[in-house]
């Protein structure tokens, strides 16, 4: 499955989940998932975030914090993932360094690397019906096979980049291992409110 198809699958899965949920929200979900590189729309003290986190995102976030010093929070409306892990973690660290709040709004959808970015918020809020999706990472092995994060021994150095990031964000290490086991890379696990609270992803509880 190519990256755009997977992003679409994540978005459709979230919409199906919303229609089956007992949660009733006034806001409607975006009509289309954001396949383009992540962008921010500024309204006063709020930056609304849409799109896939990629190699351009650190520069975009740096411009955001430098050129819009009044912005205090990022509302992640539709952030279905990332296609560059180091860039994602770099951009996330910029958010934490500035002390910004991150918010998943009602019917907002974030997944995969988007959840990593969310954890960078100094204060983190998930509004009613906001959706957080996680799964294992994967990479191509030397023989052309796919290596899944859940299959790599826990003491392997490949995990270090993510574990160090979560330590910096004060997110328990158990969350990283949970994401690897929750779903394979081709699928997505939509976190329950209980899981969101258990792993410390919100600072004020799920609204």
Task: Describe these PLM feature segments.
Residues 1-10:
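Bacterial N-terminal signal peptides that target proteins for export
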Residues 20-22:
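C-terminal motif of bacterial Sec signal peptides marking the signal peptidase cleavage site
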Residues 28-60:
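STAS-typified acidic loop motif
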Residues 49, 74, 118, 196:
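Terminal peptide-recognition signature
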Residues 70-87, 101-107:
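Short, glycine-/small-residue-enriched flexible loop/hinge segments at domain edges that mediate gating
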Residues 73, 141-207:
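Charged, glycine-interspersed solvent-exposed loop segments at helix/strand-loop junctions
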Residues 80, 96-141:
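Glycine-rich beta-to-alpha active-site loop
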Residues 86-90, 96:
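Membrane-embedded segments
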């Amino acid at each position: 499955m190519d990256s755009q198809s997977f992003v679409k699958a994540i978005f459709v899965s979230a919409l199906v989940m919303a229609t089956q949920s007992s949660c009733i929200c006034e806001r409607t979900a975006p009509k289309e998932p954001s396949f383009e590189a992540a962008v921010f729309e500024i309204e006063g003290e709020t930056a609304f975030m849409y799109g896939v986190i990629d190699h351009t995102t650190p520069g975009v976030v740096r411009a955001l914090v430098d050129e819009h010093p009044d912005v205090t929070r990022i509302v992640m409306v539709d952030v279905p993932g990332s296609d560059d892990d180091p860039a994602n973690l770099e951009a996330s660290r910029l958010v934490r360094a500035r002390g910004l709040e991150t918010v998943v709004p009602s019917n907002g959808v974030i997944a995969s690397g988007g959840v990593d970015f969310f954890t960078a918020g100094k204060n983190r809020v998930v509004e009613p019906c906001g959706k957080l999706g996680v799964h294992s990472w994967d990479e191509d092995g030397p023989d052309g096979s796919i290596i899944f994060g859940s299959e790599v021994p826990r003491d392997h150095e490949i995990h270090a980049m993510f574990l160090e990031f979560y330590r910096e964000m004060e997110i328990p290490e158990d969350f990283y291992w949970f994401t690897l086991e929750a779903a394979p890379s081709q699928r997505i696990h939509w976190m329950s409110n209980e899981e969101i609270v258990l792993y410390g992803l919100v600072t004020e509880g799920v609204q």
